[in-house]
A protein has these predicted regions:
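Asp-based phosphoryl-transfer active-site loop
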Residues: 5-28
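Glycine-rich phosphate-binding loop signature in dinucleotide/nucleotide-binding domains
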Residues: 6-7, 139-140, 194-197
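Conserved phosphoryl-transfer catalytic core
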Residues: 26-93
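Metal-dependent phosphoesterase signature
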Residues: 65-127
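Substrate-recognition element of Asp-dependent hydrolases with the DxDx(T/V) motif
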Residues: 109-110, 118-161, 173
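Short, conserved catalytic or adaptor-binding loops enriched in Gly and charged residues
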Residues: 163-171
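Conserved nucleotide-cofactor-binding alpha/beta core module
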Residues: 175-182
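Conserved Lys-Pro-Asp/Glu-containing loop-to-beta segment of HAD-superfamily phosphomonoesterases
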Residues: 182-204
Length: 204
């Protein structure tokens, strides 16, 4: 990118998928890891208030989704009646269709956190990412991340790359809690949150 373009920019906001990180890493590594470990995670964390709340909200949103017979009781009126097999079936389907539901992203992030913690996962970024981040930071520019993945998932990727922990370069993180990337008002909310004029922000 020409330096002249960045002269009038105070903040660089980066997407993850296809921008800092290969798309294949998200779809073939992270999504696959989530699916492979989903049943065990739900079994271990079924009584977790955070997980139960996320599942209940997903049930309310997707109770009419037709997957297969194993997901039939996901449409029950109470989470107490929903089996681990049913919840796993529905969530696997949502992962397959790349659902951006924040509740799904929360659960994915928690599964990935276990993988990063025990070394089964390692963040992947393009080789020019740490170089660019270091340059922008030295030039006094702020760096933020805006991705459909949860803030937790974002931090996990950048804290465990083969180039080391890159989170010291990043000022803030935003996920679908601020709004969808396809909605113009989401970017206005980010500008307000970081207290910068939109014309001083570059989204890549």
């Amino acid at each position: 990118m020409e330096l002249k373009v960045l002269d009038s920019i105070d903040v660089v906001i980066l997407d993850i998928e296809g921008t800092t990180t290969p798309i294949d890493f998200v779809h073939k590594t992270l999504f696959l890891f989530a699916k492979q470990n989903l049943h065990n995670f739900l079994n271990k964390n079924r009584n977790s208030e955070i997980v139960r709340k996320a599942l209940d909200e997903l049930r309310s949103i997707y109770m009419n989704v037709e997957v297969d017979s194993t997901g039939s009781d996901f449409r029950s009126t109470s989470m107490d009646d929903v089996s681990i097999e049913s919840a796993t079936s529905i969530l696997n389907h949502l992962i397959d269709v790349d659902s951006k539901a924040s509740q799904l992203k929360l659960i994915e992030g928690m599964i990935w956190e276990e993988g990063y913690r025990d070394g089964r996962l390692k963040g992947e970024v393009y080789s020019d990412v740490p170089v660019s981040m270091k340059k922008w930071k030295s030039d006094g520019k702020e760096i933020c991340i805006y991705s459909s993945g949860s803030v937790l998932a974002q931090k996990l990727i950048f804290s465990s790359t083969e180039y080391g922990d890159l989170t010291s370069y990043i000022t803030d993180y935003f996920d679908t809690g601020i709004g969808k990337k396809t909605e113009p008002e989401s970017y206005g909310k980010i500008a307000a949150a970081i207290k910068k004029s939109p014309e001083r922000i570059l989204f890549i």
